Design a protein with these regions (language model features):
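Conserved nucleotide-sugar donor-binding catalytic segment
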Residues: 79, 127, 144-225
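Short, acidic, metal-binding catalytic loop of nucleotide-sugar glycosyltransferases
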Residues: 21-31
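Conserved short acidic donor-positioning loop in nucleotide-sugar-dependent glycosyltransferases
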Residues: 23, 39-40, 99
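Glycine-rich, basic loop-to-helix element that forms the pyrophosphate-binding segment
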Residues: 66-89
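A conserved acidic beta->alpha catalytic loop
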Residues: 38-47, 66-68
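Conserved donor NDP-sugar-binding/catalytic core segment of glycosyltransferases
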Residues: 107-139
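Short aromatic/hydrophobic "clamp" motif used to bind/position activated sugar donors
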Residues: 94
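C-terminal subregions of glycosyltransferases and related glycan-biosynthesis enzymes
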Residues: 182-184, 189, 196, 211-355
Length: 355
């Protein structure tokens, strides 16, 4: 058994010590390797990494070519690097880590491997994480129960950072090639890809410090673009985990509906360059988001199909809400009843021995 740590850097020399030493401090109960992908840094990141390579032969460095005259999409770029590292990895398990983040506990890998070796149906062992900024620490509160969870349970509502997980390496070279062609292998895309092939076990222990600089891509987006990005994510998720399309559609329905209702503002809100970039990427995926943005150019049959998908999803979402309200009402009524009445009700409904 072997585990691979896939670490990515770009001009993060000041964080190399903290991130790499947090890996080296882990209690790892098997062979391991640390595959580092650098995206053409110019601030001394590579030199910092090489200092650790002289002391530890388990660290391997992959430096990517970078044209200073080209503007790269950050997500596509880091996805390509991760997939390159994964392609060269030898571990039956792996973890990912961004260069400015770090691990907070020494035992989580040991705990995860113990659980996953006992249950081969698990594709992910997930833990909790904390957002860390210069003046604040905020612990995430995921909407998921401790223990084993199905793919459906996670995909409907939950967010756990992929770097707070241990993954079983379920990808063969054919699947890696497919993901390379897709282009997206970042955070929740990784979660979706793994949930296509297995379940998840969740342990509510904070193991990752997820650094917040205040200048992230998401932080700088308008509300309109955040909805656009979420709707675009729907197409990516369904490519990674197509058998859970219904759950994924419910997860992203609010943004899909928003973009459909406000599609006429697409170029005005985003600007010509950014809007054209989304269109170019969406065309490659050829999914629902692309059809929504181009709704007014679709033929009658395709328009009807888009409307039906949105209408059916809205109905399904309404039914789920009604069921939830009934369950909640039942709990409230039970809580308000006198204890002796609840006990009497439970006794009356308890089957006799031998039934």
């Amino acid at each position: 058994m072997k585990i691979s740590f896939l670490v990515t850097y770009y001009n993060q020399a000041r964080f190399v010590k903290q991130s790499l030493e947090s890996i080296l401090a882990l209690n790892v109960p098997c062979d391991y390797e640390i595959l580092v992908g650098d995206d053409g840094s110019t601030d001394g990141t590579v030199e910092e990494i090489k200092k650790y390579m002289t002391e530890n032969s388990n660290i391997k460095l992959f430096v990517m070519d970078r044209d200073v005259n080209v503007t790269y999409d950050a997500v596509l770029r880091v996805s390509a690097i991760r997939l390159h590292l994964l392609e060269n990895s030898k571990g039956s398990y792996y973890c990912i880590l961004d260069g400015d983040d770090w691990y907070l506990t020494k035992t989580f890998v040991q705990e995860a491997l113990h659980i996953m070796e006992q249950d081969q149906t698990l594709s992910i062992c997930a833990f909790n994480f904390a957002w860390v900024s210069n003046d604040d620490i905020k612990i995430h509160s995921p909407s998921i129960k401790e223990g084993k969870n199905s793919a459906q349970e996670y995909l409907l509502t939950t967010y756990i950072h992929a770097a707070a997980c241990v993954f079983r390496n379920v990808f063969d070279m054919e699947k890696i090639q497919f993901m390379k062609e897709l282009g997206f292998f970042d955070d929740q895309n990784i979660m979706a890809a793994h949930l296509q092939d297995g379940g998840m076990y969740y342990i509510p222990k904070v193991v990752l410090a997820y650094r917040q600089t205040g200048s992230g891509i998401w932080t700088g987006m308008s509300q309109y673009e955040k909805h656009v990005l979420d709707a675009f994510e729907y197409d990516i998720f369904t490519k990674h985990a197509h058998k859970y399309e219904k759950e994924i559609r419910l997860r992203f329905f609010t943004s899909l509906k928003f973009v459909w209702s406000n599609r006429d503002r697409f170029y005005i809100e985003l600007g010509s360059k950014k809007a054209s970039n989304y269109i170019s990427l969406a065309k490659k995926l050829d999914g629902l988001f692309y059809r929504i943005i181009n709704f007014d150019k679709l033929n009658t049959k395709d328009r009807h199909c888009v409307r039906k998908i949105l209408k059916d999803t809205l109905l399904h979402k309404f039914i789920r809400c009604v069921k939830y309200m009934f369950r909640l009402a039942g709990k409230i009524v039970k809580a308000l009843l006198p204890y002796w009445l609840v006990d009497l009700f439970n006794k009356k409904n308890k089957p006799a021995i031998g039934q």
